[in-house]
Each structure stands twice: as structure tokens, then as C-alpha cells.
Design a protein with these regions (language model features):
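Internal intein/HINT superfamily modules and their associated LAGLIDADG
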Residues: 1-127
Length: 127
């Protein structure tokens, strides 16, 4: 188990958010959006992070893809909790504010509108 400060450090240094925008003909706009946070590492390390996240009611899963397992945090409720845990400090990739902006868009469900989708594309660097 890790302390809150250690968990924040792990999230700042190893956490990498992924925003996937893909064509979905069944969606209202013709596109769907997936957003999740990944942490890569050794399985024992990821399991200890997973146990620590459970203290904050954050559900996650360990996905075995590639050469190292990945701890994946999905679901807007879980990502909102993670966003609240993250301090307003610069991260290694300077993407904390970007993560918080994306979470804010999902919270108010703007990702389901054309304007929100355009905002997400700008954040992602597509537009």
C-alpha cells in the first residue's frame, strides 16, 4: 500500500492518459470517444497500486498486452477521483492540466456534442 503522496507521485510520473476517437456509425455524431489512464510496470507493482486505488474507490484492471502488464483505469467516475487526487504540479510530460480538461469535458457530457468532440480533437492535436 502506498500513501496518498506516493500515489500522486506514481500517477504524475508513470500515468499516461489515452484519448481514442473512432468512427462509430451507431453513435449520434458518427464518432465515439474512449478515455482511460494507463500505468505500465511489473505485475506485483501494479497490483499494489491497484490495492491502494481501491482505498479511494477507484476500480482498475490489469491488462497483459505487449511485453509488460498495464494497469488501466476507465470509467468517468474513476477518472474524476484520479483527477481530484492529482495536484496541480507539472508532470514529466506536462499533461496533468490536459487530463483534467478532458475529464471536465466528459463530466458535463460535452464529448457527445460536436463542439466537445472538436475540443477533444484540439487537445489531442488532430485539429
Amino acid at each position: 500500500m502506498y500513501s496518498k503522496e506516493m500515489l500522486q507521485g506514481i500517477l504524475l510520473s508513470l500515468g499516461r492518459h489515452n484519448l481514442v476517437i473512432y468512427v462509430n456509425e451507431n453513435a449520434k455524431l458518427g464518432y465515439s470517444v474512449k478515455f482511460y489512464l494507463d500505468i505500465r510496470g511489473e505485475e506485483e507493482f501494479l497490483e499494489s497500486i491497484q490495492r491502494t486505488l481501491l482505498q479511494y474507490s477507484v476500480l482498475s484492471s490489469i491488462v497483459s498486452s505487449g511485453n509488460r502488464p498495464t494497469l488501466r483505469i476507465t470509467g468517468i467516475k474513476n477518472l474524476v477521483i484520479i483527477s481530484a487526487l492529482l495536484p496541480d504540479l507539472p508532470s514529466y510530460r506536462n499533461d496533468v492540466q490536459e487530463f483534467k480538461d478532458i475529464v471536465a469535458i466528459f463530466v458535463v457530457k460535452r464529448h457527445k456534442t460536436l463542439e466537445g468532440l472538436e475540443e477533444l480533437m484540439k487537445i489531442k492535436g488532430v485539429l
